[in-house]
Amino acid sequence: MLTCSVHPLPYRANPADYFAIIRHAPGAVLLDSGRPTADRGRHDLLSAWPLEQLAVLPDESGSDFLQRLRDNLTRLGEASVPLDLPFAGGLIGYLSYDFGRHLEQLPSVARDDLHLPDARFGLYAWALISDHQLATSQLVFHPTLADSERQRLIELFSGTTSDEIEPFRLTAPMSPDLSADEYRQALERIQQYIQAGDCYQVNFAQRFRAECQGDPWAAYCALRAACPTPFSGFQSLPEGGAVLSLSPERFVKVSQGLVETRPIKGTRPRGQTAAEDAANAAELLASPKDRAENLMIVDL
C-alpha cells in the first residue's frame, strides 16, 4: 500500500486562520472541533479543490449513489498515513435526513423549497490537519496528488491572507415556519399520542429563516465565537452558498468495527456560582430519569 506524505506547518489552534486562505476555493470544507475554546475534539481538518463533486440525483436510488461514492474511492486508491492522523484522502460531505427517502419507502409531505441535493460529497486528495493534543498542523498529501499541486499548497499555506471578509447580516427578522398557535396545537397532539401509547418520544422541530446578505464564512465565525462546539463544520456549495453546522453531539462514528454515538439528553440551569453549577451537574448525573432517556436514545 502506498503512503501519504506529510508537510509540517506552524501550529494554529484556531482552524479559521488557515481556512480563511481557501474559503473561496471550489469545494472548500472545514471539519472543526471548536478549539481553542471547546476542548473535547482532537483534530481539525480542512481541504478544497476536490477531484470530483458528487451529488445524489433526484431519481437516483440510495444504493446507486453509495456505489458511486465507493467507485470514486476505489479510483483514488487506498493509502496509509505515517502518523496517527484521521484522514488519508477520501470523501467529505453531507447526507441529509431526506436522503433516507432514497433508501426506504417513506412518506414525503414536506415541500422542497431549498432545492439542495439530499447528499453531496467531494473527493479530496489532500487535507490540512491540526492535532490539538500534539499541537501540530500539517498538510497530508495522497500519493496520487501531483508534485506541482503539493508545492502550490505548501506555498499557499506558508503565506497569509489579507482578504477582507464581507460582513454578514440578516436583512429581516427570523420567522418560523409555524405560528405560535400551530406550534402549541402540535405539542398538544404529541402529548395525546404519548398518553395513548402511540409513541414515547417525538423529535419535534421547526425551521426559522430570514433574508440575509454577506459572506457565509463571516456568519460561521460569529457563531463559532458565540457557541464553540466540538462537532462543527463549514461546506461551501457550488452555487455560492454554504452549509454551516454547529453541534455539541456526535450522531454516529464508525471506526475499526466499532460504532459510537454521543447524544446529549437532560439539562439543568446554569447556577449563579461555581458551587451551584457543581450541584446541578451532580444532580443531573445522579438522575435515573435523565440516564434512562440517554440510554434510550443510544439504543434507538
Residues covered by each model-derived region:
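Extended alpha-helical targeting/anchoring segments
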Residues: 1-300
